[in-house]
């Protein structure tokens, strides 16, 4: 198993200096995201492109002074309502959404046709916090997500997009070190 440990990362990240842009608030990010979506989504519609926002990973409030906003179902709903379009959607990263503390099949039904891409991954929360502050990537059949129920929920909504098994644990001989 590969340990993706937010608890271990948080102290390292929080001590890093702000970027050259200084602090960027959540409000500024929401304004910039809305500006971007209003400019880009109509162009994406013209060519049949689907945009798919991925949750912030790791789910840390700020990194180097830059706030993070894609950390809850409510924020993803806000994103999809900024510009209502079949081109404006989400990446259903099961691991991240599960670590937010949500039920995956229910969340799949919530977003339904707005899901444009699926990261079919499983995790195990080690912190007891929501959002999780410490977790481990797992094999598909070892984590906290009922993968059969998840797959059934994609079938039930008629999902026809890409589903990618993602973030598999390290295998013998592999290294995630840089």
How should each PLM-predicted stretch be described?
Residues 1-12:
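Glycine-rich, aromatic-flanked loop segments that form ligand/cofactor-binding clefts
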Residues 10-21, 35-38, 42-46, 50, ...:
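Histidine-acidic metal/acid-base catalytic patches
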Residues 57:
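Helix-loop segments that flank and shape redox-cofactor active sites
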């Amino acid at each position: 198993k590969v340990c993706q440990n937010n608890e271990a990362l948080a102290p390292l990240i929080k001590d890093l200096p702000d970027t050259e842009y200084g602090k960027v608030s959540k409000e500024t990010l929401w304004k910039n995201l809305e500006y971007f979506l209003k400019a880009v989504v109509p162009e994406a519609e013209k060519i049949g492109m689907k945009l798919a926002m991925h949750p912030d990973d790791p789910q840390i409030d700020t990194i180097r002074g830059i706030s993070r906003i894609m950390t809850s179902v409510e924020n993803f709903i806000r994103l999809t309502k900024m510009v209502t379009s079949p081109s404006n959607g989400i990446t259903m990263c099961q691991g991240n959404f599960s670590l937010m503390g949500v039920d995956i099949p229910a969340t799949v039904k919530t977003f339904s046709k707005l899901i444009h891409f699926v990261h079919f991954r499983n995790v195990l929360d080690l912190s007891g916090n929501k959002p999780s502050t410490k977790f481990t990537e797992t094999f598909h059949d070892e984590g906290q997500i009922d993968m059969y129920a998840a797959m059934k929920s994609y079938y039930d909504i008629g999902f026809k997009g890409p589903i990618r098994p993602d973030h598999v644990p390290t295998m013998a001989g592999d290294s995630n070190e840089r």
